[in-house]
């Protein structure tokens, strides 16, 4: 498309170009954010730029942040967006940053811009009356994200069970592969023992001294003990070896070797003479310890000298020794780790043998394990609810620890069962023979090992299985049809997609189903490649979709990101990406993904990797019960060849909650709220001068935990200090020049939580890099109830006391509920206009706001929750200790993704919705069940 002049309208020739297409020769570099902003501003009418005081360059960035919070966030944010269109400032925003639920409506907004000819058309449609096709679609289909009705539920259940069985089949094959190695070791050890006893009957006595229950693998433990002894001896010998001369070291070492040989000779001679004397076992144990210590010394001295030669020689001698000592300590830890693994695997091997040959009903045990998984998924909400009702933080922590342990135990139990199956078929072939023979078990083992190994080798590169077997595709498809489909004119009858498209008004008689493409059907042009998605080309904002790059390990010592366990990844419309505070770079052209995929990833709240909330046991639990909404993505350019065992590595990473992160070839991505839920982080990183934030995370107690997280990360990562404001005193001279009534709804953060308050919008000053003389401004629009609300919202509040902080698990929005959140967002957002924003940044003491030293997020008493009209506010609960504020954020893990995963888990129960007579009762039951599941996942550490 030819670039229009600021004052020109599209010509008839330009109308021939399909909306969303563009002339690539005039497209600025996607990795140059400021070039994108300049090009965006140039697309606006000159009158728009003049009215909004928009500079021609890329300075004075304005950003709109839409936070996570599921369908509630999407609906409330839609109201805020329409309010900004009402006040005429929507087209002032250069950047649109979204997380999770905010991305639903943000993606729809971006698609409206890509299909429009001018940004002013979109703003006019959003500000107009509710007779546009896209608004009709959202109202009609906003609840489609969650299955409803018998047919829809059975469809979701089929997907869930198919994926769950596929995952367990892969895990079973992996367990069998490991089991083949273990059973092969057992067979080899038994074969060697039989041969040794045949050649020398004395071995029979030695083997008979071993306990019958001893796992074969534990025979390797003495080697580990010897290795650990040698490392310890080397550690204590380091200082002496470093200081002594070479001759002295050799002399002492030779003396130690001679003493060892003499002691061994003495034991052989003396043992034959007094072998039958009392305390024989004690004497042998003492001699064994002495032998071990001397052997450790003999081997430890050379090891100490070798390690001293390995470390760098720079620095003092003491530093040289300290470096060698640190290296030996690491080796000792590795030795202990391997010994622990041998102990654990040996114990599992013994348990597998017990299940195979000592349990009466072996198959019933496996079936019971499957039932246990289903029961565990069903009872987890009740366990979490019980711990939460106790009101004690320790109870929640104990529950989290218990669930983490249960996850590990479930993995071990699953592997053990598959090993017991292998024991049954392999050693059963040996014991079923009338005469002891090695051929049958070897043949059976080979018959299992060859196809298992062949399958792993042939399918190991199929890393796409990881995403296909998760719930991501199900979630993405519904999200695309529900929200991105609202901007697709092809879904609406009689609408020309080359003209107004979804911005067109409905016929006078209202929307008609005739010719309408149902939300259950796939329709072309719903989604778009991220590189082709460019709302900025039509004057819309550059859309930043934020996700979390999970990272629990690091090659630099495995301590980096110890608390966060994740990095922010922002993906910009046009095909650019940014990890943390690094420079922008292009998305890989062959793996840029689509807008719908990125928005779905941004809302993947329940996954084995959940940023700071990642725990190994919980990752195991999520994998085993099929709660997998995360996404594996390769950022490599040029399409590097897939790893031979990419699928295996990814599945093990999910099972153990271990992710390589930034430096790994494949990245595990999840909900952007797992790092930062308000979506303002990316705007602060871009040094935006004005940020309007729709803070919609679940916060029934108005504790502002998402805000606390933003304040802390902005200070640490971005050198941006967020200072909340309050209105100046009524006696301040500034009110002689400003209308106090116009600022009645602006105030301190605490005032948002007050039961009776006129304040409904909070303001913060942002100081970048310590430049307090040139601050930026953050305007927080948070769902709350203030005195000036319209009558219908106050009445809805009376009937629904939890409004507007109802659980994000509630995705069954009724008409009144949808309209209430939408209207609330529109009411609160209308207080943000150009005049107020300009007044905030006025110099010379003319700003109506001043620093509020009492509004320190995370370091003050939690305000009293908002009460119903006519009811007294509940007493404010005691503020949690500072340490607890670093815990799990309830708001982050409770998004629509959770509901999608949880709903399929209770799908049989949801089928009751089909009974028309119980329609309303069933809907209420759905809300209760999903609320409990959401509470459980939200409490996970």
Predicted regions and their residues:
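Catalytic domains of lipid- and phosphate-ester/thioester hydrolases
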Residues: 2-941
């Amino acid at each position: 498309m030819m670039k229009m002049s600021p004052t020109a309208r599209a010509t008839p020739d330009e109308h021939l170009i399909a909306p969303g297409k563009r002339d690539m020769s005039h497209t600025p570099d996607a990795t140059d954010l400021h070039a994108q902003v300049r090009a965006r501003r140039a697309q606006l009418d000159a009158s728009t730029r003049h009215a909004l005081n928009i500079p021609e360059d890329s300075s004075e960035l304005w950003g709109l942040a839409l936070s996570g919070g599921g369908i509630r966030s999407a609906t409330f944010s839609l109201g805020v967006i329409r309010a900004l269109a009402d006040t005429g400032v929507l087209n002032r925003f250069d950047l649109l940053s979204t997380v999770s639920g905010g991305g639903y409506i943000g993606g729809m907004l971006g698609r409206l811009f890509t299909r429009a000819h001018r940004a002013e058309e979109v703003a006019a449609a959003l500000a107009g009356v509710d007779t546009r096709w896209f608004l009709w679609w959202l109202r009609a289909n906003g609840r489609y994200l969650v299955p409803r009705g018998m047919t829809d539920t059975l469809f979701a259940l089929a997907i869930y069970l198919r994926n769950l069985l596929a995952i367990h089949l892969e895990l079973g094959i992996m367990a069998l592969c490991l089991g083949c190695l273990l059973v092969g070791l057992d067979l080899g050890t038994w074969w060697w023992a039989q041969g040794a006893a045949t050649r020398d009957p004395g071995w029979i006595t030695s083997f008979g001294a071993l306990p019958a229950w001893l796992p074969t693998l534990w025979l390797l433990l003495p080697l580990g003990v010897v290795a650990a002894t040698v490392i310890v001896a080397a550690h204590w010998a380091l200082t002496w070896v470093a200081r002594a001369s070479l001759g002295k070291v050799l002399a002492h070492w030779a003396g130690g070797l001679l003493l060892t040989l003499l002691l061994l000779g003495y034991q052989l001679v003396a043992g034959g003479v007094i072998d039958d004397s009392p305390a024989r076992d004690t004497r042998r144990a003492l001699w064994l310890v002495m032998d071990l210590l001397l052997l450790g010394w003999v081997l430890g001295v050379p090891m100490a000298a070798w390690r001293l030669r390995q470390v760098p020689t720079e620095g003092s001698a003491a530093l040289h020794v300290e470096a060698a000592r640190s290296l030996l300590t690491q080796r000792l830890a590795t030795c202990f780790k391997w010994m622990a693994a041998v102990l654990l695997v040996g114990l599992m091997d013994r348990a597998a043998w017990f299940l195979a040959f000592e349990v009466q009903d072996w198959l019933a045990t496996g079936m019971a394990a499957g039932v246990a998984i289903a029961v565990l998924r069903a009872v987890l909400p009740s366990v979490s609810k019980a711990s939460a009702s106790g009101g004690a933080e320790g109870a929640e922590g104990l529950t989290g620890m218990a669930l983490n342990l249960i996850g590990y135990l479930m993995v071990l139990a699953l592997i053990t069962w598959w090993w017991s199956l292998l024991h049954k078929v392999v050693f059963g072939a040996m014991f079923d023979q009338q005469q002891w023979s090695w051929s049958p078990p070897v043949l059976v083992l080979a018959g299992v090992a060859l196809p298992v190994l062949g399958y792993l080798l042939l399918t190991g590169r199929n890393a796409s299985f990881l995403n296909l077997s998760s719930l991501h595709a199900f979630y993405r498809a519904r999200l695309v049809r529900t929200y991105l489909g609202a901007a697709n004119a092809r879904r609406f009858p009689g609408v020309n997609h080359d003209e107004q498209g979804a911005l067109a008004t409905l016929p006078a008689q209202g929307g008609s189903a005739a010719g309408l493409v149902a939300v259950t059907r796939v329709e072309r042009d719903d989604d778009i490649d991220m590189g082709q998605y460019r709302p900025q080309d039509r004057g819309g904002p550059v859309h930043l979709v934020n996700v979390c790059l999970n990272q629990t390990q690091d090659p630099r010592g495995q301590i980096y990101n110890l608390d966060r366990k994740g990095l922010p990844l922002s993906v910009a419309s046009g095909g650019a990406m940014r990890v943390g505070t690094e420079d922008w770079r292009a998305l890989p052209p062959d793996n840029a993904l689509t807008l719908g995929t990125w928005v779905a990833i941004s809302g993947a709240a329940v996954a084995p990797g959940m940023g700071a909330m990642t725990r190994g046991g919980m990752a195991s639990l999520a994998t085993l019960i099929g709660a997998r909404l995360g996404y594996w993505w390769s950022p490599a350019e040029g399409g590097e060849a897939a790893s031979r065992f990419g699928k295996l590595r990814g599945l093990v990473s999910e099972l153990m909650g271990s992710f390589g992160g930034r430096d790994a070839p494949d990245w595990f991505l999840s909900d952007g709220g797992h790092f930062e839920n308000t979506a303002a982080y990316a705007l602060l990183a871009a040094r935006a001068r004005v940020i309007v934030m729709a803070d919609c995370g679940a916060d029934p107690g108005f504790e502002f935990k998402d805000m606390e997280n933003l304040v802390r990360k902005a200070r640490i990562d971005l050198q941006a200090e967020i200072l909340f404001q309050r209105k100046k005193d009524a006696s301040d001279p500034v009110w002689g020049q400003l209308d106090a009534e116009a600022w009645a709804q602006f105030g301190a953060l605490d005032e948002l939580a007050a039961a009776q308050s006129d304040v409904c919008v909070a303001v913060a000053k942002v100081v970048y890099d310590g430049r307090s003389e040139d601050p930026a401004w953050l305007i927080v629009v948070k769902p709350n109830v203030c005195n000036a609300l319209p009558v219908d919202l106050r009445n809805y509040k009376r009937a629904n006391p939890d409004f507007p902080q109802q659980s994000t698990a509630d995705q069954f929005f009724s008409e009144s509920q949808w309209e209430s959140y939408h209207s609330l967002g529109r009411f609160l957002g209308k207080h943000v206009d150009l005049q107020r924003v300009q007044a905030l940044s006025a110099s010379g003491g003319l700003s109506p706001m001043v620093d509020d030293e009492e509004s320190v997020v995370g370091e003050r008493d939690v305000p009293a929750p908002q009460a119903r009209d006519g009811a007294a506010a509940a007493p404010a609960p005691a503020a949690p200790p500072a340490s607890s504020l670093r815990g799990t954020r309830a708001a982050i893990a409770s998004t629509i993704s959770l509901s999608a995963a949880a709903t399929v888990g209770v799908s049989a129960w949801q089928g009751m919705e089909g009974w028309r007579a119980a329609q309303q009762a069933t809907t209420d039951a759905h809300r209760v069940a999903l609320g409990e599941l959401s509470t459980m996942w939200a409490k996970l550490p």
